[in-house]
Amino acid sequence: MEPSDMPAGYHCPLDSAPWDETRDPQSTELIPRRAISRSPTCARCRNHGVTAHLKGHKRLCLFQACECHKCVLILERRRVMAAQVALRRQQEAQLKKHLMRRGEASPKAPNHFRKGTTQPQVPSGKENIAPQPQTPHGAVLLAPTPPGKNSCGPLLLSHPPEASPLSWTPVPPGPWVPGHWLPPGFSMPPPVVCRLLYQEPAVSLPPFPGFDPGTSLQLPTHGPFTTCPGSHPVLTAPLSGEPQGPPSQPRTHSTLILQPCGTPDPLQLQPQASGASCLARTSGPSEWQLQQEAAEALVGLKDSSQAPRVTPSVPPNPAWISLLHPCGPPAPAGGRGFQPVGPCLRPSPAPSVALHIGRLGSISLLS
């Protein structure tokens, strides 16, 4: 009998018995199991052992007014989750507005980076340059490392700040700068400060022939002056209380000139008009000593009983000051004494006094 002719339900009970005993009975039986639903259920009902789907159950929940500790905990959790959702939505809205103002990226850019995308890599050919943190003055540190060779150290590329009157000094290197700083690109000289004195105390002149006892001379008696390089110390001051000449000629003033020894060219003084009152001075390295010796020389004239014209006991120095009368030519620098004054429009020649002041030069009083 062929296998195809055998009835479908025919089987040997002896052969099938041992096979049925060894086989798992659960695998043979088809038990209809209840399908597991993925739809959400009510949490309040679930706490009390009841399974109810949320669809259409919001207003029909039997435990909606329950205040047990489980239901209270669920209520607090819902409030916290609602606050978190509201905060996240507010932050996303602010971020979108900020990006739209700058126009840097689309509003979906934060979500794009949030999903774990990698940042753009360094382009090929620039792997050997590692940028370092910037210094306060804008200098950037670059560490060039050529392939196959060891670098000698980071190189500092810096640029000087904007032009300023003060000299620029680089900032000392920080802990990340093992190399040396480059020298500054330029150096500026320090600024020159000049002070202007508006009022000077008066020193009385001793009486001598040709001068009024009420004559006063303006001399600075406080503090050294500010030095200004490239000039010679000269002090000139008009004296008041002099007799006036003819009305047709302008009245001249007596003047005191102080000049140190060693000046290459003598300074000449021109007569001043009646309305002019000038106090011109420039400071030098020993201005204060010059003023003190000049004041001592003026005090020494009190005890002098010589003629109006006093010649120094020391041979004259070529560097002494050249004396000018209001209407006479200057005396030569290398001559002895003073040259005679030529004819003048004034009725009588004016007296003068010259006194030598050691190494500082000579002092001359004109009228």
UniProtKB/Swiss-Prot annotation:
This is Doublesex- and mab-3-related transcription factor C2. May be involved in sexual development. The keyword Zinc applies. It comes from Homo sapiens (Human). The lineage of its organism: Eukaryota, Metazoa, Chordata, Craniata, Vertebrata. Belongs to the DMRT family. Expressed in testis and pancreas. GO terms for molecular function: DNA-binding transcription factor activity, RNA polymerase II-specific; identical protein binding; metal ion binding; sequence-specific double-stranded DNA binding. Residues 42-89 bind DNA. Residues 1-25, 103-138 are annotated as: Disordered. Gene3D superfamilies: DM DNA-binding domain (4.10.1040.10). It is found in: Nucleus. Transmembrane segments: none annotated. GO terms for biological process: heterochromatin organization; male meiosis I; sex differentiation; spermatid nucleus elongation. Keywords: Differentiation, DNA-binding, Metal-binding, Nucleus, Sexual differentiation, Transcription, Transcription regulation, Zinc. GO terms for cellular component: chromatin; nucleus; XY body.
